[in-house]
Regions:
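C-terminal and inter-domain tail/linker signature
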Residues: 1-334
């Protein structure tokens, strides 16, 4: 695994300038750090964006304009070589919250003029000292829950502000032990293969116990919430997930990397699923297939996994099933 300190510094400087610049300077800042063919994959309703100007005006302008002043609160930051790209791609992965005062409408959501925490996961590929592509997952459904919108049914897990790693060592600003990084990557790949290839997205306790500590914590996305212990995870997530959805196929990931005890991936989409019943209290059984864009970040403790942070682009997934939560929110505003 390569030394990626220069790539870390580049992305940290990018974060600093994006967060501190005025809105009219966004395109200039992005152009300074990004390649000419820079593009981003974003959760709905932003979706796929190309060019510095489009990313500036379609993504960062509404974020900075709606939640002002914005503060980036990082809980996870690490670098790794993409194991899915012939071990060539250099990627920076991060997670945390954007804090701000919600004082202007955001994706049609009515502001409450109070402080909010917008949960995010962000990924950037760096080549030749330029950011060439990126992805950002915003947990808009969690924001809806913070706002108390009635369109979101009660979650099966704990709804809370998602913390970072329990050991408070989520920010890998310095170099890490390459052997520990490889251990993490091997473990999450073993767990992935057991779940996807062996069990077809079915989670059995005896298999979970092979890869997870019993007191694991599953920090789920908006609409689901967090679960504690293997038993709690099965009750709060896997049973409702398996009861409500039918697995169609696994599409793979775009990125899979690790550094020290942290690792993870994202896909676009990772999974194709269709509802076989009620999922999140919002779907009915149908033959319509829909795409799940998912982020999974993990913390390894010893030879098993201890924590998992998840983002699911539920707005995109549900819209393809005829459930448009942003339109429902606009109706509430009226």
């Amino acid at each position: 695994m390569a030394d990626l300190q220069a790539e870390k510094k580049l992305v940290l400087n990018y974060f600093s300038e994006i967060d501190s610049c005025d809105i009219e300077s966004l395109t200039e800042v992005i152009s300074k750090y990004a390649s000419e063919d820079f593009s981003m994959k974003c959760t709905h309703p932003f979706n796929e964006l190309g060019s510095a100007d489009i990313v500036a005006n379609n993504l960062w302008r509404p974020i900075k304009d709606s939640f002002s002043p914005i503060q980036r609160r990082l809980d996870i930051f690490y670098a790794g070589i993409n194991s899915l790209d012939k071990n060539k791609g250099k990627w920076i992965s991060s997670m945390g919250h954007f804090m701000g005062v919600f004082n202007k409408p955001f994706v049609g959501l009515k502001p409450n003029n109070k402080s909010i925490l917008l949960r995010f996961a962000e990924f950037y590929k760096v080549e030749n000292n330029k950011i060439t592509e990126g992805a950002i997952f915003l947990d808009v459904m969690n924001l809806m829950q913070q706002l108390g919108l009635s369109i979101i049914p009660q979650s099966s897990g704990l709804v809370c502000v998602t913390p970072g790693p329990m050991n408070h060592k989520g920010l890998k600003f310095n170099t890490s032990n390459q052997n520990e990084s490889q251990k993490t990557l091997d473990l999450i790949h073993r767990m992935r293969d057991r779940l996807v290839k062996g069990s077809k997205m079915q989670s059995y306790k005896e298999e979970l116990e092979l890869d997870w500590h019993n007191d694991m914590i599953w920090w789920g996305p908006g609409g689901i919430g967090a679960s504690y212990t293997i038993d709690g995870y099965q009750k709060g997530h896997t049973k409702p997930f398996q009861d409500g959805l039918e697995f169609v196929r696994f599409n793979g990931h775009i990125l899979s990397s690790a550094e020290d005890d942290l690792g993870g991936w994202f896909g676009w989409p990772n999974l194709i699923m269709k509802p076989k019943g009620e999922y999140l209290g919002l779907t009915n059984a149908s033959d319509i297939e829909s795409e799940m864009r998912v982020v999974d970040l993990y913390r390894r403790q010893g030879d098993k996994l201890a924590e998992n942070w998840i983002f699911i682009d539920h707005l995109h997934f549900l819209k393809k099933l005829g459930v448009d939560l942003l339109e429902r929110a606009k109706f509430l505003n009226q």
